[in-house]
Swiss-Prot record:
SMART domains reported in the protein's UniProt record: AAA, REC
Organism of origin: Klebsiella oxytoca
Binding positions for ATP per the UniProt entry: G172, T173, R329, R359
UniProt name for this protein: Transcriptional regulatory protein ZraR
UniProt modified residues of type 4-aspartylphosphate: D56
GO cellular component: cytoplasm
Phosphoprotein recorded as keyword: yes
Amino acid sequence: MSGEQVDILVVDDDISHCTILQALLRGWGYRVALANNGLQALEKVREKVFDLVLCDIRMAEMDGIETLKEIKTFNPSIPVLIMTAYSSVDTAVEALKSGALDYLIKPLDFDKLQLTLSEALAHTRLSESPVTETPAAQFGMVGDSPAMRALLNNITLVAPSDATVLIHGESGTGKELVARALHASSARSRRPLVILNCAALNESLLESELFGHEKGAFTGADKRREGRFVEADGGTLFLDEIGDISPLMQVRLLRAIQEREVQRVGSNQTLSVDVRLIAATHRDLAEEVSAGRFRQDLYYRLNVVTIDMPPLRHRREDIPPLARYFLQRYAERNRKAVQGFTPQAMDLLIHYAWPGNIRELENAVERAVVLLTGEYISERELPLAITGTPVADAPHGDDSIQPLVEVEKEAILAALERTGGNKTEAARRLGITRKTLLAKLSR
């Protein structure tokens, strides 16, 4: 793993310190990306595969420990080095327990930094299996059912090619995880993975997001912006919910795919792009074509290779390992010593229909961990939709007044359910910071 091939992400809210580290690391032959807070770091880690993350421990909004845990949750294989002042060595020890590979004392000794980086990267090489870790293991795709094995086999076959991939499946089945695995296992893995949910934007905003815009192209366009195609140049562009785009956007997207070039909104300049396209939808695009709602020529361009996502109800044997996987994740995050599920609770999970698929299972397990006061998750902690019968409230005395902390937790959990588990959006809707939301959940 030579310096020219190594990508390092530096995370520090001290911009001057970031700049110094960037210049230093580049001088040693590394490629360097910067993030000025934890949220930026998570965005970058989701978009690109880094060989190492160098993260400060003291940052506003999301500190280094929380950033470390989120990175490790997303991809446990990324080595993370923590930077800390003398006064916070105890916190650095906590970081090691949370998965950090090592820590460095600030102000940094540059010789020590160079040695630690070399050792960390060497450790990473040695820890890699001769057989490359499966995309499933890297991105949390858990299960050994026939349907899951077939899915993983498809990923292994398709990933090395540059073919356009259409992922079809119900909401919550893990289409984005498959896109990430395809990118990470491809020759483009060192280049960006850019993700865009087409259903989240109206036509004009989607056009600007995809192709970029010139300054003054429309009201509010105060500077030129590159689109997602240009951002993904050399890498992979994942377009989720492609079946929801308008007829006009279908025409523009078709041209971009056919010609491998785009134009910013408000510009006549043509930009060549080298992008592997992965698209996903919950719709049956063949039916959409028959109904005249989706262009046949675009459908053929997208449908080069199809990967069908099995719904969770079609692979019930994967529910126990998935539930245990999420249990471990959220028990660690909430610092709870949870031993597992009662047989009755697991039986309910296995036999529930899961209309929201894996996402619904994850949310149910997270909710159960947050509400749990004992060692085993029982039907009491599971949502009413799963148990099928109301679970009696825990006694609070004759006046039946819930403690405020429980009321707050219920409000937070309700907000999380409505935002699909998005903690940042849930915090915004509740009028609190993300850090406050996480603190209240962990009580």
